[in-house]
Amino acid sequence: LTNIFILRQGFRQELIRKKLLKSQLQPFLDEIEVEIEADTLVEKLSSFERLVVELLRAVVADYRLIVMREIGTLVNEGELEKIHAFMKHYAKQGFSFLYISPHFEEILQICGRAVVMSNGKVIKALAGEQMQAQTLNFYSEEYNAKVRHHIESLKERQSNKIVFEGRHLCGDVIFNFNLKVAQGECVVIQSLEEGIFRDLYLLFQGEKQDEIHPGTCYLEGRTTKICGDRGIAFIREEPTETMLFYDMSYMDNLCIAMDHRVKNIWGNRKMKWCIRADFEEILGENVFDKRMQELTEMEKYDLVYTRIMLQKPKIVFCVQPFKGADLRHRIHIWELQEKLLRKGIAVVILAVNMADALSLADRLVRIDKGTVVTEYQRKDFGMLPRNIPWKALYDENGRI
């Protein structure tokens, strides 16, 4: 209620009359058939409800141009379809929308025109009959080719060795969740409910593990605590902002997860020199002498993922790894994750929307209402909803 009415420009009431404001809000909610308690704190709203609040705030303020930026990374495909329906509803009332997304599948669902941009420049403007998947996919052909090659190469490196197992994991929302992950396997876990995502995030990061669940985790057959086990790595959401230490050197950032492998790594100049010699060709000769603030986004991603490779974990948990990345950076992140898989490291991706994660997945687990709803093997990906990215690479039998 506060966000929609009181914080908007032009609100002039000196006394806040909540009852009156609630009565003014209800017609807007009824119009789009959404139920949200007006007194609910924003921090307790789901991502979908927050998007609705943002949209209603713009509508109530009569902002005629509304920018929707990468909303597909915040909600699942069912909720995304509802948001699209709201946008179409308000578009008929004269509101205009600027929809920013890295995924052509989303653009085709909602937009009447599209502009393809790269390095701040317009490459192509599309409208009418040009708004087809074949036309738009032309601009991501490099990405598509890499995905196809990855899918084909999977046949050569299948493994049945289980490296991680979680039994009877529970949280505030999750109940009795079981998970097995094989060596070099990529598993995508899609949470269809806000609380599930929060539970899984805390579980995989190892925060408050004893409080979150009474279940047991096993790494290569031995019981383990996720937090502090160097055989398990965790890549946070937007890692270039959340996993780098800008008051430390590039080399110290790179070696920070090697303390279990090399004694006194911080004072071992010879080892650091060897690491530099080994990785200069891969990372670049100049990055080791740069200040952290001088690194490009690509160089930051290289640093994060190379640090993980030096840690040599058996499994890596990633939270929405492609969030906020444009096509160029998505390709690079995809390549880095594919490199982990080729080294036999298992990758578990936690996502709200499958998006690019499906292009790497061997298996998809969808969770709703605290338990597994559906599990798809790669051969079943052709049965996924038609608007899912990369679904076009599979027919109904899961073949390329």
Q: Where does each model-flagged region fall?
A:
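Flexible loop/N-cap segments at domain edges
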Residues: 161-296, 306
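ABC-family P-loop ATPase nucleotide-binding domains
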Residues: 1-57, 237, 242-307, 311-313
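Switch/coupling loops of ABC transporter nucleotide-binding domains
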Residues: 95, 230, 344-345
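Flexible nucleotide-interacting loop at or near the entrance of a catalytic core
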Residues: 119-183
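Conserved beta-strand-loop-alpha-helix hinge in the C-terminal portion
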Residues: 121-144, 371-397
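Hydrophobic alpha-helical bundles that form the membrane domains of multi-pass transporters
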Residues: 1-143, 321-322, 329, 335-337
